[in-house]
Amino acid sequence: IIMGKMAVAAASITLMVADVVDHTNYIAKSRASIEALKSANLLKSVTINALILGEHGVGKETLARHIIAAPVVDASSFNELLALIETNSSLIVKNFHKITNYKKLKIALDSHKTRIIATSSLPIGESLTDEFFSLKITIPPLRERMEDVFPLMEKFAFEAHMMFDGGMGDEVSLKEIVPDLSKNCYSLRRSVYNAYLMSSFGEEEILSMMERFLAERIGGRNDYRDLLYLFDVPMIRSGYAKFGSQLSISKKFG
């Protein structure tokens, strides 16, 4: 019965995800993401080089993979990049701002006629951009694309179901999760995964986790007094959430 419930939950999330995700898993609900996806679709039909800009975790590599199916190489590994240029007709180059020798790169690309779709979390000078790329796509951070946040949470929830084989998180409500957008998709994914993990914790897991946490912090003369808030704060917060007032909490807690 439990597995049946999990299968239904996973299927439900799959349907929600399918509504906003194409086969590349690039979410496009906000105006900015839709425009970026339109540009990416145009790039699939031509062979020009393109640069994708944006903060860490905004989906640059995902969009690049939507444009071309090609090896991915980090620009900081310059010798590896040069070697791959010799043997591939197209490449995805991460962290283009870390290139150490742009002149040598340009010679290699022209010599082997290799196409690149590059990504960068830092701005690239206008002259370099014009020299290497015919099109530039900028993906704004998630805090400026709020329409994409919940669909991304649905996607990460589906990932969590698959990762944990449907063994946890069937009671998690995505609307109750506070999304962490500080590091875009990296922190947002962690928010969802943490919620799924915590929903599966029983008393034994919580005690074990607290024991490990406290073991790294005890050693002073007033540890019990200083660390008692770790019990008090969750009790008070959960009391307010469940009972609504200090008077009700007092009656319930005794």
Predicted regions and their residues:
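Walker A/P-loop
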Residues: 47-75, 80
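Conserved RecA-like P-loop NTPase ATPase core
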Residues: 36, 52, 58, 64-67, ...
